[in-house]
């Protein structure tokens, strides 16, 4: 499972012109599910997202987590992150989970996030989405679980 974590000052996701998820300061995370992933990987990714220290403390050091700052968590499914880009001029998606598994694990991740944290929003799995964000820093990390 992969999560592209971006620290944001604000972000929103639209589907067909309608805002389906939005946060103020926090983390926008693009999530890709891979064929061998399970709920265990989703649990590990969520733990890392809530506790990864990417927000600055009073001394300007990245020492605070999402939980510490009380920011929002916006989860957006993006199977293209699992693409194999090593060969040729076209990405291969054979390294991405089948849609049914991707939907199941993304939904599990989202439900666990909502159960463990108050400020959670999401895009819509499989939809054509427009993601708007104000990247803070920019601070971006690829998490591979």
UniProtKB/Swiss-Prot annotation:
Classification via Gene3D superfamilies: D-tyrosyl-tRNA(Tyr) deacylase
CDD domains hit by this protein: Dtyr_deacylase (cd00563)
GO CC terms: cytoplasm
Reaction(s) the record says it catalyses: glycyl-tRNA(Ala) + H2O = tRNA(Ala) + glycine + H(+); a D-aminoacyl-tRNA + H2O = a tRNA + a D-alpha-amino acid + H(+)
EC number: 3.1.1.96
Subcellular location: Cytoplasm
Coarse class of the protein's main subcellular location: cytoplasm
A GO molecular-function annotation: Gly-tRNA(Ala) deacylase activity
Positions occupied by motif Gly-cisPro motif, important for rejection of L-amino acids: 137-138
Alphabetical GO biological process terms: D-amino acid catabolic process
NCBIfam families: D-aminoacyl-tRNA deacylase
PANTHER family: D-AMINOACYL-TRNA DEACYLASE 1, D-TYROSYL-TRNA TYR DEACYLASE
Subunit architecture: Homodimer.
General function of this protein: An aminoacyl-tRNA editing enzyme that deacylates mischarged D-aminoacyl-tRNAs. Also deacylates mischarged glycyl-tRNA(Ala), protecting cells against glycine mischarging by AlaRS. Acts via tRNA-based rather than protein-based catalysis; rejects L-amino acids rather than detecting D-amino acids in the active site. By recycling D-aminoacyl-tRNA to D-amino acids and free tRNA molecules, this enzyme counteracts the toxicity associated with the formation of D-aminoacyl-tRNA entities in vivo and helps enforce protein L-homochirality.
Stated family: Belongs to the DTD family.
Protein name: D-aminoacyl-tRNA deacylase
Name of encoding gene: dtd
């Amino acid at each position: 499972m992969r999560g592209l974590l971006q620290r944001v000052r604000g972000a929103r996701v639209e589907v067909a012109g309608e805002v389906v998820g939005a946060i103020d300061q926090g983390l926008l995370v693009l999530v890709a599910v891979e064929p061998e992933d399970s709920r265990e990987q989703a649990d590990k990714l969520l733990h890392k997202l809530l506790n990864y220290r990417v927000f600055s403390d009073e001394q300007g050091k990245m020492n605070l987590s999402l939980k510490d700052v009380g920011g929002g968590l916006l989860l957006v499914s993006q199977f293209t992150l699992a693409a194999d880009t090593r060969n040729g001029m076209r990405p291969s998606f054979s390294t991405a989970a089948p849609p049914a598994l991707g939907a199941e694990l993304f939904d599990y991740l989202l439900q666990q996030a909502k159960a463990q944290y108050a400020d959670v929003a999401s895009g819509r799995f499989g939809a054509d989405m427009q993601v708007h964000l104000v990247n803070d820093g920019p601070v971006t990390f690829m998490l591979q679980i």
